[in-house]
Amino acid sequence: MARKARMADIFSHWYHLIENFQASAKEFYAAVEAALQRRQIPDLKTSRVDWREGGLLSAKREYLRIKRKELVFDISAAPFGTGFFFSWWLGELPSGFWALVSIIPFFGPLMELFLRRHTYYKADTALMFQESVRAAVNEVIDQMTSAKGIRALTDLEKKPILRELYRR
């Protein structure tokens, strides 16, 4: 059962539409979870979350959420016309004390700026988390497409879009 999601501060995104291809999102999510388990990523948690397709009364879409500390991936797989698309969004979702601080007008951002340290280690582990999940997603997509005789994605097609990771 999926739960209502909280929005993360997104800093990386990837998507790809595969024409003339159909698959099961639930099977894709289960295969990604298995691929991640084999990688033994520390502090990893998975769940299903619901995101609305539009406004308040719109339908909900189930995503696979992969969380490690304050970093979250929301992964989607869904039909689109005669094709099927895959996408993921990677962001930061503050928890605990910093979640409370982040909602304080004016002072919250100042406290984060001066008291919350962004280190090389945090940047490195964020990139390793992204790379591990990206590799798992690509592995599963390659397995699914090759099973149906569809060419594998190129390296360029697998490349994520990074935003502001180093400006944190």
Where are these regions (language model features)?
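A composition-biased, non-transmembrane "mature-region" signal
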Residues: M1-R168
